[in-house]
Amino acid sequence: GMDKASSGRVWVNNKEITKLNDKELIEYRRNDIGFVFQFYNLIQNLTAKENVELATQLCSDALNVDDILEEVGLQDRKNNFPSQLSGGEQQRVAIARAIAKNPKLLLCDEPTGALDYKTGKQILKLLQDTCRKEKMTVIIITHNTAITPMSDKVIHFKNGTAEKVEINENPISIDNIEW
């Protein structure tokens, strides 16, 4: 949904998104997809809470902003501006912003890249729990193969091509995974 397909077709949730025009694609991204990028894209003159609230104004089924900020461990930092937050805290604001939209599909590019081990596990648990509770599909792009046991499905890529697909019948809680 970020780029136009150069060939083939892409289906998501029984919808062929390759047939969507530009306006439909914008609506699809706005309503159905949440993004966590490696670069956080926070608005510098908005507080952490306001950055999350801004995203929730674009959708109709948003989650409670204060609850999500608490779940990412930022309840005491929600009134700080991005420049007053560490890189890990900024990453957690970006994650909260994406989750608060309550998207059908959440795409996370290295969501724990700037986080320490303990906070990384906290965020992965939040993603795992949110996926189950909200019936949200969460796709995590990562180089950390140690976390694959938490997943329902693992797709290994090499040189931009899906090389192997593994189905995990019994995903493990992130609480029980060490790396």
Question: Where are the regions that the model predicts?
Answer:
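ABC family nucleotide-binding domain
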Residues: 1-157
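Conserved beta-strand-loop-alpha-helix hinge in the C-terminal portion
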Residues: 161-179
